[in-house]
A protein has these predicted regions:
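Short, flexible helix-coil linker/hinge segments at the edges of structured domains or between repeats
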Residues: 94-130
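Nucleotide 5′-phosphate-binding alpha/beta core
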Residues: 1-36, 42-74, 80-83, 140
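Adenylate-forming
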Residues: 119-170
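Short loop/turn segments at strand-loop or loop-helix junctions that form parts
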Residues: 36-39, 102-109, 151-152
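Acidic/glycine-enriched edge-of-secondary-structure segments
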Residues: 42-52, 111-123, 143-148
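Short, well-ordered, mixed-charge alpha-helical segments that flank or form enzyme active sites
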Residues: 83-87, 109-116, 155-157
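Conserved AMP-binding loop of ANL adenylate-forming enzymes
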Residues: 66-104
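Short amphipathic alpha-helical face segments that pack within enzyme cores
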Residues: 55, 59, 89, 153-156
Length: 170
């Protein structure tokens, strides 16, 4: 059995080193995406991605009700954008449904550094900056009707949207 022959995979193997070592010969000539996790705890774990994010999110798209996530609607993603699989996936989801994905990047590694340095005021300013960028995009682009964000960003966005009678499907 292959699993017995190969042994248990160690997640730490993903930290550093040539990423191409994980690309099998069958995919060596395919476009490869890389994404990272765990960068706030040292060298990030780098993982490869070929087409699975497209396949996953095209299937996911079929579960979205068109009345809540209209085809052709533009999307706004507020969250970590790169190097993240999620950014690729949400951008592809918007495109697959006929829309454009606008992005506001949130750098969680920077937020963690600010917290570790005790820079809570600076962290709050950064959070406000991210929300302000999102609101600017929402005001500038009437076609944005769908939102992908983290729960911690959703609340302040809603607090700023509802009084101004702006609405998106979240």
């Amino acid at each position: 059995d292959d699993l017995d022959r190969l042994g248990e995979f160690q997640a730490e193997w993903l930290r550093g080193g040539p990423v191409r070592r994980w690309v099998t010969r069958a995919y060596k000539d395919q476009p490869i995406y890389t994404f990272e996790t765990g960068g706030s705890t040292g060298v990030p774990k780098s993982r490869i991605n070929i087409n699975d994010f497209r396949i996953d999110y095209e299937l996911y798209s079929k579960t979205l009700p068109d009345d809540k996530f209209p085809k052709g609607a533009d999307w706004l993603m507020v969250g970590p954008s790169g190097p993240r699989r999620l950014r690729l996936a949400i951008e592809h989801l918007a495109q697959h449904r006929g829309g454009i994905c606008f992005m506001v990047d949130l750098d969680p590694r920077w937020v963690i550094k600010l917290i570790k340095m005790g820079e809570m005021e600076m962290m709050e300013l950064y959070k406000r900056h991210v929300i302000d960028q999102a609101l600017t995009l929402l005001r500038a682009h009437d076609g944005i009707h769908c939102l992908f964000t983290t729960p911690k960003r959703l609340k302040p966005l809603c607090e700023n949207l509802w009084p101004k009678k702006m609405a998106i499907n979240a």
